[in-house]
Amino acid sequence: MSSSIEQKKGSTRQRKCGFCKSNRDKECGQLLISENQKVAAHHKCMLFSSALVSSHSDNESLGGFSIEDVQKEIKRGTKLMCSLCHCPGATIGCDVKTCHRTYHYHCALHDKAQIREKPSQGIYMVYCRKHKKTAHNSEADLEESFNEHELEPSSPKTKKKSRKGRPRKTNLKGLPEDSRSTSSHGTDEMESSSYRDRSPHRSSPNDTRPKCGFCHVGEEENEARGKLHIFNAKKAAAHYKCMLFSSGTVQLTTTSRAEFGDFDIKTVLQEIKRGKRMKCTLCSQPGATIGCEIKACVKTYHYHCGVQDKAKYIENMSRGIYKLYCKNHSGNDERDEEDEERESKSRGRVAIDQQLTQQQLNGN
């Protein structure tokens, strides 16, 4: 019995990314594995792959990307040799279109390429060391396009790259396999714009509909994440489940219902602000305010990422218990439930004593 468990653990440790063929989790992000165990890829290797884009379909996904698309990109990578290590799987191309340098993610780091990452806009770009200056010179153009304070690169000024600062989704389906495999940039025409929307959580910046301050998507995810509550005065919005399990939100009592999903709006806004510094264990995006209940555990999630990572949610409405245990600590919930029940009874007795004391004082 124990030997089979050890073998299973050993096989998990031996799994390698389909792109970089390594276990470099520290450099390349978490190694994500599909449910059928057939596809494995580092999150960063997928985010920066030139022809891979986010998927919002109901089919099984890997870190927000379609399993089918990841497999196609891994297959495309078998024909692309890395400019640094000369091994296949190098699907990350320099974002200067005329440049033929292509990398694995960790090789781009080692070759001192410039990594540009702006999760809030779905922008993930790489400039080889030769074209760093090009990226630096075009930062001002991008800042003007997005009207934000953070500086990110735009592409060099060429006729084909005139649409600056417009993240978009590229649909590669329906193209011949050869056209997807001949270049580290996917297809030339489809990569004529500088930016590729790789974020698993973001839609087009032209979409002005309210988005959840935690998971960054809108009402299209209401079925899975609960109603999207909107607070127009503060220009804030949040899904019910995202608020319910966030570590710092306060749900109001039945006698003082708020208009913002029964939550104290002040605590929701504070949590959204805190979430900007909290990156998700699964997808590495900000807004992950749902932490594992084990104090020594540092795992933190968006609501849907916790579900995808097989974390265990404890939801007991009658007792006001809403907790998450990561998959490594999901066995701790039963013991913790007993502790919580004892604490709840203790709090109930204290409340009754306080009420009796208050009645006695009022009687006097």
UniProtKB/Swiss-Prot annotation:
Assigned keywords, A-Z: Acetylation, Centromere, Chromosome, DNA-binding, Isopeptide bond, Kinetochore, Metal-binding, Nucleus, Phosphoprotein, Repeat, Transcription, Transcription regulation, Ubl conjugation, Zinc, Zinc-finger
Tissues showing expression: At 12.5 dpc it is highly expressed in the embryonic central nervous system and at lower levels in other tissues. Very low levels present throughout the adult brain.
Alphabetical list of CDD domains matching this protein: ePHD1_PHF6, ePHD2_PHF6
PHD-type ZnF: 80-132, 278-330
Comp. bias regions, Polar residues: 354-364
GO annotation, biological process: blastocyst hatching; negative regulation of transcription by RNA polymerase II
Residues where Phosphoserine is found: 138, 145, 155, 183, 199
Phosphothreonine modification, residue list: 357
Entry's localization field: Nucleus; Nucleus, Nucleolus; Chromosome, Centromere, Kinetochore
Sequence segments annotated as region (Extended PHD1 domain (ePHD1)): 14-132
Cross-link (Glycyl lysine isopeptide (Lys-Gly) (interchain with G-Cter in SUMO2)): 173, 227
Entry's Gene Ontology cellular component terms: kinetochore; nucleolus; nucleoplasm; nucleus
Zinc finger annotations (C2HC pre-PHD-type) as residue ranges: 14-52, 209-249
Classification via PROSITE patterns: EPHD
An example molecular function term from Gene Ontology annotations: phosphoprotein binding
Amino acid composition bias (Basic residues), ranges on this chain: 157-171
Organism superkingdom: Eukaryota
Location of the motif Nuclear localization signal: 13-16, 129-133
Annotated stretches, region: Extended PHD2 domain (ePHD2): 209-330
Oligomeric and partner information: Interacts with UBTF. Interacts with the NuRD complex component RBBP4 (via the nucleolar localization motif), the interaction mediates transcriptional repression activity.
Biological role: Transcriptional regulator that associates with ribosomal RNA promoters and suppresses ribosomal RNA (rRNA) transcription.
Protein name: PHD finger protein 6
Annotated organism of origin: Mus musculus
Gene name linked to the record: Phf6
